[in-house]
């Protein structure tokens, strides 16, 4: 037996100063890749990994840009008579752009990891098995600290405010496939069968507080203004699929496939959908009766196909079949009004929601003349 392999590694660093103040960005990128073959290339394995670390500041928002474009240039940037030191204008409801960008400290950090690995084995001659796995992990953090300021008619902040947030995204996908490819005589056949599964998970946590003690940049102080929230979303998808392709002498072409997908977006009894497709083609220029024109026609092919597609995407809604119930509706009990005690339905979703189906019929013509000097493709869809 023999063994061969190849690998590579790289690292890059980026430090970019923003055009405007407090918009710097810094990132590291690491890439690793390797492939190995064993048993005279009957067994191959490989992996690739990308790690990206980034951090930066992002203090520019709509108010800052309006301030840069419209704030009067005759107003001084600094004003020693102002308690917070920034020049203001009483005639325009816009912030001093430099002052506004300096009193708000907005930082972001992110870590992203992408990992892919595969194994391919030739079980017997012409029959191959392949396993793929992909993993992605994202983690981001954001922090916005707003200091004390007095920016005239735009507003003032007598005590610091703080917002912090973090989010994670975890995703994995696995795929198993069997491929059989065989050529015998003028016959060419290719078979594929496979199974795949994937899962995505999003989690976010956010907190904020206002009027916190100066110089203590943590979520402490005024408990009456402290707030926190979190969110969690999960999505799973499983698929079975198969395909057969056949051609005879590259004259008569046939292909058929089917896949069955199941999505966690839909309720029990409506999670699965089947999506077939079939196509046929005829290369007329390869027929014997076409030989007198072979110096003129490079290709004359007619084809027809039918396919059924499924769509599970409903915006960013991972739970479209779950109704949302809230509270806060007032009602009368005896002579007393009970405020916000009665539950009510915010949104009612259909329980029989399922895959969106689209069917397409197609006929087409491919034409090539005079060694490719003139080509034409025509398609009609129903």
In which residue ranges do the predicted regions lie?
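Short, glycine-/polar-rich solvent-exposed loops and beta-turns at beta-strand/coil boundaries
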Residues: 23-26, 61, 293-298
